[in-house]
């Protein structure tokens, strides 16, 4: 080491440590102090300044306190390394510490924090409490904590549930319990992040494709993935360097209805059947989360036009990106064929401008009968024909581009292709739209 480095060089950082809280008790000498039990990774000493982190609620300003005493196997010690400890934390009762809280040095990497967090949850709620949450646990734990506990519990018990029916029944019961708590807490959050597709600028559809015993391709129900805002700094660890993903914040609003309405719209408009929260093992169907519209007994013309199946297959195809592998090409063919099948019976909305007498469609802005007055449909230059008719799969997408007062003519694809090309959901993102020509439509039909 040179003189400059000796005098002015950076000091070597102290080794990091973590202590994931498995249990806690009020201090005997001072009621504001807290006695915590957990496994320490690294070395912790009496007098150390520690940072208190709840992974479900990461704050911008670190919460700090001091270790007052340490105990290992019933004996008081000044230092402990890589072992289970009992530590008394100054003013710990005021710092929001609960099972799963991580106490750590200031220089601890995020990966070590996450490891300490999951280990603590696993020991506390899977090993010791066997998936049973106390009333206090339910009050303190966040939705993301409960999701993590469920995934740890599932990982431990999934294999034996396949072998024993009683274990399978218990696992399903536990899932219902955990999901009920997640639902209750999810809608009370201030916000949540959603994984979006870079290709479509719409929520990414998480779905898996596999072949059954007969060789037929099976595609799982598409899900949206929701991420707690406290996890947003750790996305690289969760998703790697996947350039197909973007992340957008959903504000729950002052009435706490934003997340609920967002999930409801995913089901109605995008064909997304549910959500994954903090990982694919916490998968909750939309009908278990929100009230969905029921149209039984309504006149068909009164039912708002939606095409979730059409959107689902279009977006799954678009998410494939470049078809540079055999599997991608196969999936593309499957998705586009299913898109075509949905297209054959789809009712679509063509934006319509009436020349006078707008009151004819005041009560219901959609009609399947051409008005007996002059009107225009939205057109743009065609690809194979002179003009392309602009149509939308639902009112939400139509109004985004044409406003709340727009009227629409309900059309089907086959009746239009003889006269025009048709573009579905034209807008700012070409990959979220699809241009249909008569030639393409007939070619797919022949296959």
Where are the language model's segments positioned?
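An interfacial alpha-helical scaffold signature
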Residues: 2-12, 113-447
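Beta-strand/loop-dominated core regions that host nucleotide or nucleotide-derived cofactor-binding catalytic loops
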Residues: 13-119
């Amino acid at each position: 080491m040179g003189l400059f480095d000796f005098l002015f060089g950076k000091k070597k950082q102290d080794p990091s440590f973590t202590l994931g809280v498995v249990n806690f008790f009020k201090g005997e000498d001072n009621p504001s102090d807290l006695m915590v039990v957990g496994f320490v990774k690294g070395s912790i000493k009496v007098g150390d300044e520690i940072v208190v982190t709840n992974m479900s609620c990461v704050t911008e300003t670190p919460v700090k306190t001091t270790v007052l005493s340490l105990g290992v196997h019933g004996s008081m010690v000044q230092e402990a390394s890589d072992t289970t400890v009992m530590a008394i934390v100054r003013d710990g009762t005021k710092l929001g510490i609960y099972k799963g809280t991580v106490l750590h040095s200031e220089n601890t990497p995020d990966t070590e924090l996450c490891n300490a967090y999951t280990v603590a949850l696993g020991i506390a709620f899977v090993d010791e409490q066997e998936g049973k949450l106390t009333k206090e646990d339910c009050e303190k734990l966040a939705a993301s904590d409960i999701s993590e506990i469920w995934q740890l519990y599932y990982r431990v018990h999934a294999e034996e549930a396949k072998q024993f029916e009683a274990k399978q029944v218990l696992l399903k019961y536990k899932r219902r319990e955990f999901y009920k708590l997640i639902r209750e807490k999810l809608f009370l959050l201030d916000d949540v992040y959603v994984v979006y597709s870079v290709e479509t600028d719409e929520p990414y559809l998480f779905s898996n494709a596999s072949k059954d015993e007969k060789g037929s391709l099976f595609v799982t129900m598409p899900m949206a993935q929701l991420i707690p805002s406290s996890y947003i700094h750790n996305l690289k660890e969760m998703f790697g360097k996947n350039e197909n993903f973007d992340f957008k914040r959903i504000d729950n609003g002052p009435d706490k209805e934003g997340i609920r309405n967002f999930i409801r719209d995913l089901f109605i408009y995008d064909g997304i059947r549910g959500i994954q929260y903090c990982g694919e093992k916490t998968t909750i169907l939309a009908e278990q989360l929100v009230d969905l519209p029921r149209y039984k007994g309504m006149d068909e013309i009164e039912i708002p036009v939606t095409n979730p199946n059409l959107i689902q297959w279009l977006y799954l195809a678009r998410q494939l990106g470049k078809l540079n592998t055999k599997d991608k090409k196969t999936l593309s063919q499957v998705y586009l064929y299913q898109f075509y099948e949905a297209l054959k019976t789809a009712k679509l909305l063509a934006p319509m401008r009436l020349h006078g007498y707008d009151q004819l469609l005041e009560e219901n802005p959609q009609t399947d009968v051409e008005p007996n007055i002059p009107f225009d449909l939205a057109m743009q230059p065609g690809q194979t024909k002179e003009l392309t008719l602009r149509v939308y799969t639902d009112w939400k997408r139509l109004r985004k581009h044409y406003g709340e007062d727009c009227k629409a003519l309900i059309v089907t694809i086959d009746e239009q292709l003889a006269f025009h090309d048709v573009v579905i959901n034209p807008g700012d993102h070409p990959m979220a739209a699809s241009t249909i020509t008569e030639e393409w439509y007939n070619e797919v039909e022949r296959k």
